[in-house]
Every structure is written in C-alpha cells, then in structure tokens.
C-alpha cells in the first residue's frame, strides 16, 4: 500500500476516543472485555450508547460471529449494532450499541432482595406478560431467520429505560449464536456444551446427541413468568422425588386450571418435539386476555429499578454474585462440562461466565431471511398501544414517573 495513502487513511479513520466520552463510565466487565456507557462528544444527540471493547487484540471467532449476525438482524426485540470501530494503534475492536438501562437478571434480583428484606415489591401481571411476549417475539424472529441464540438467560435479556424505546425488550449477546439449516444438528458439529448450566433444556442435561431450536426458545421462558423468583430454589434442588408441576404451583397460588398454568405446562414439556414453539406460545389464550401485552413493559407505571452503577478498575462487575459464580464453576469442574469465562449481555454481567471460542466452527450453509418484519406479517405479533407517555423529570432517587396516575409499585403485596 502506498505510504502516503496509508497515512491519509489513518488520519481520516474515525477513532472511538475522538467521538465518544466514556472514561470512568464502565458498567460491565468480563473475559469478553469491557462495556462503557458513552455519549457523543459533538452533542449531535443526547442518547446514551453502550461501547463494548473486545478483550485482547484482533477479532475472536465469537466477536466475528456476533458482528456478522447483528449486522443482518433487524428487529425491535433484538439488540441493534450501530457501528464497529477498529483501533489500528492497539488492535482493539469496539462495538457500539444502544444503551439499555436494565436487564432481566437485575430486575429479578431487585424483587428477590425486596422479598428478603420483608418489603416485597410485587410485579404487575401486565409487566410480566409484556416481558414474556416480547421475548417470544424476538426469539421467533431469530428462528424464522435460521438463527439459534444458544445462550438465552435473564442477563442476556435487556430492557430499555427512559427514552423513545422505553420498556422495550432487547435480546443480546450473539457470541454463541449459530446459523442452522437442518431440523437436527449433531452436537459434535458445534460446541460440546451450549447454554449456561442453570438454563439448559432437559434434553441437553439428559445427554441428547442432537438438538433443535427447542433448546433455545421455550425452556428458558419459565424465568420470565411471574413465579420464577420464588421457584428458583426449587429448580436447583438435586432431587426431584415425587416432583410434579402442580405441587410446586400450588404453593405459589397458581391454579391448575388457569391459562398461566396451561402455558407453563406447554413451555416446560420435557419432550422437545411436543414442546410448543415460540410462535405457538405467542398465540396462547394467556396473551389474549386482559391485561394485553404492550410494547412498553413499564406502561402506566414508574420504573423502580436503580440505574446501572459505574465500576472502578478493580471492582468486580457483580459483587453480590461471586458466590453463585464460584458454585457454578465448582459444579462445572465436577461434571466436566463447564466453560467459565465470557458472559456478555452487551451491558452488564450476570450469572456464570462463558469462554470465548477460538476454534472455528464447522462451516454451515444457509442464509438469513430479511425480507419482512415478523410483526407486520403476523397479526398475533401486534402489541397493545399503551398511548403516548409524557415523562416528568427524574426524582432524586433516579426513578421516573408518568404524568398520569398509574398503579404504583409499593412495599405492599397487591393483586394485578
């Protein structure tokens, strides 16, 4: 390459440090790298962005896969990759995303903590339903375009804060995602282990030699149902003697003849062939009764969840989850199936980490179908419009409220 042209090209290349202010605003850390909350220096807009710096030099296979998929995938419930920056000086890769203030892991953690403090904050049923519906919508879009996410868990389900996309769910972290072009895919052709341990579908735990997109779409949906926060300990028990869904649901006041119970039964079916798909789940009667799902999961309510805190250079991403991570790593070591390392939800750190793959996967063929938006083509994908939301200035606690008188979160247990 001509030297003068190379110098000119280097001078014209956009550098992330020239465009964004992010120093001291780290909100996430893992073996994948670091995530910063950033703003434009030129003041062209007031939006918050998430800058993800890939760890190491060059581009790993995981980063390549994530970039390639996110450049093609366009859906309201899938995280949007705005731009990729390559720093030739230090060979760093930066990914620019929309910033999501919350994620499902921290939402669940907030409610579990409030319950432990004897001041439970009840989730409105409408919020739970909207969360679940939007997650299913995003998963269906991925599967309709022949993409398996393979690492769905609460930490990878982002929720937008105040702004144009308030309350919008975003599925993040495509580092483990794969294209597929056949009903069954041998496990040996890809990774020996997929999906974080606690969120694996039963067929993976039982040693299935093949898996379908059923591992990706429905078993994890139990975590988005209202009963998840109280059921988490039950699902971690080592023994399931005389176990039945009805026995567990009874103590959480879920009636066996309710639409909620029937949907849970269909989502938790052990046989992946009989388990309902994300599209079928979206058409379930549960979503057709009031309150209807909305595009803003916080519609009519305040947002009680604290904003993301900035981390220091030495501070771990999630101090409260060290014990869980150590326990997870111990289980993985015992079973010989774990891969601690990179857990990337584009913004924040959740439960056990996963390792970045450095061995190229087996080549697969097949393309992405991007010709239509699922929401426009499927009448069941339409959300109820919650109406315009006029936000007031934030309070000193960092929460926001609507101008109307919505149902308030309180420290009392209410029925919604």
From Swiss-Prot:
E.C. code: 2.7.11.22, 2.7.11.23
Q: Which keywords label this protein?
A: Activator, ATP-binding, Kinase, Nucleotide-binding, Nucleus, Repressor, Serine/threonine-protein kinase, Transcription, Transcription regulation, Transferase
Q: Which cofactors does this gene product need?
A: Mg(2+)
Origin: domain of life = Eukaryota
Using the UniProt record, name the top-level EC class of this enzyme in a single word. Answer: transferase
> What GO CC annotations are associated with the protein?
nucleus
InterPro entries found in the cross-reference section: CDK, Kinase-like_dom_sf, Prot_kinase_dom, Protein_kinase_ATP_BS, Ser/Thr_kinase_AS
Entry's Gene Ontology molecular function annotations: ATP binding; cyclin-dependent protein serine/threonine kinase activity; protein kinase activity; protein serine kinase activity; protein serine/threonine kinase activity; RNA polymerase II CTD heptapeptide repeat kinase activity
Query: A single Pfam family, by name?
Result: Pkinase
Regions of biased composition (Low complexity) lie at: 325-343
Span list, region Interaction with CCNC: 1-15
Q: Where is this region: Disordered?
A: 313-416
The record's principal subcellular location, in a coarse class, is nucleus
Q: What does this protein do?
A: Component of the Mediator complex, a coactivator involved in regulated gene transcription of nearly all RNA polymerase II-dependent genes. Mediator functions as a bridge to convey information from gene-specific regulatory proteins to the basal RNA polymerase II transcription machinery. Mediator is recruited to promoters by direct interactions with regulatory proteins and serves as a scaffold for the assembly of a functional pre-initiation complex with RNA polymerase II and the general transcription factors.
Hey, which family's this protein in? Answer: Belongs to the protein kinase superfamily. CMGC Ser/Thr protein kinase family. CDC2/CDKX subfamily.
Assembly notes: Component of the Mediator complex. Interacts with ccnc.
Name-wise, this protein is Cyclin-dependent kinase 8
User: What organism is recorded for this protein?
Assistant: Xenopus laevis (African clawed frog)
By which gene is this protein encoded? cdk8
């Amino acid at each position: 390459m001509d030297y003068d042209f190379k110098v000119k090209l280097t001078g014209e290349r956009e550098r992330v440090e020239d465009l964004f202010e992010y120093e001291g605003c780290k909100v996430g850390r893992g073996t994948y790298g670091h995530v910063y909350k950033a703003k434009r220096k030129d003041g062209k807009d007031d939006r918050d962005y998430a800058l993800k710096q890939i760890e190491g030099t060059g581009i790993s296979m995981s980063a390549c896969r994530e970039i390639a998929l996110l450049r093609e995938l366009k859906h309201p419930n899938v995280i949007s990759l705005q731009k990729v920056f390559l720093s030739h000086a230090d060979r760093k890769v930066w990914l620019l995303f929309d910033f999501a203030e919350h994620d499902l892991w921290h939402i669940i953690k907030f409610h579990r903590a409030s319950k432990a403090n004897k001041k439970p904050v009840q989730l409105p049923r409408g919020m739970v339903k909207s969360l679940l519906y939007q997650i299913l919508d995003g998963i269906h879009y991925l599967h309709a375009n022949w993409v398996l996410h393979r690492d769905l868990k609460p930490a990878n389900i982002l929720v937008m804060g105040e702004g144009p996309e308030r309350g919008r769910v975003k599925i993040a972290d495509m580092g483990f995602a794969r294209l597929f072009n056949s009903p069954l895919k041998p496990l040996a052709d890809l990774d020996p282990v997929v999906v974080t341990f606690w969120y694996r579908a039963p067929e993976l735990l039982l040693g299935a030699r093949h898996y379908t997109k059923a591992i990706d779409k429905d078993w994890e949906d139990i975590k988005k149902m209202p009963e998840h926060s109280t059921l988490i300990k039950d699902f971690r028990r080592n023994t399931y003697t005389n176990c039945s869904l009805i026995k567990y649901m009874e103590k959480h006041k879920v009636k066996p003849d309710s639409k909620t119970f029937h949907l849970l039964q269909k989502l938790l079916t052990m046989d992946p062939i009989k388990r309902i798909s994300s599209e079928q789940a979206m058409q379930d009667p549960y979503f057709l009764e009031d309150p209807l799902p909305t595009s803003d999961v916080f519609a009519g309510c305040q947002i009680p969840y604290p904003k993301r805190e900035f981390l220091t250079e030495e501070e771990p991403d999630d101090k409260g989850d060290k014990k869980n991570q150590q326990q997870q790593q111990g289980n993985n070591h015992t079973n010989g199936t774990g891969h601690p390392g990179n857990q990337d939800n584009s913004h924040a750190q959740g439960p056990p980490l996963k390792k970045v793959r450095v061995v190229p996967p087996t080549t697969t063929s097949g393309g992405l179908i991007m010709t239509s938006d699922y929401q426009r083509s499927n009448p069941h994908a339409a959300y109820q419009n919650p109406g315009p939301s006029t936000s007031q200035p934030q309070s000193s606690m960092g929460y926001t409220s609507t101008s109307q008188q919505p149902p308030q979160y309180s420290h009392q247990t209410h029925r919604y």
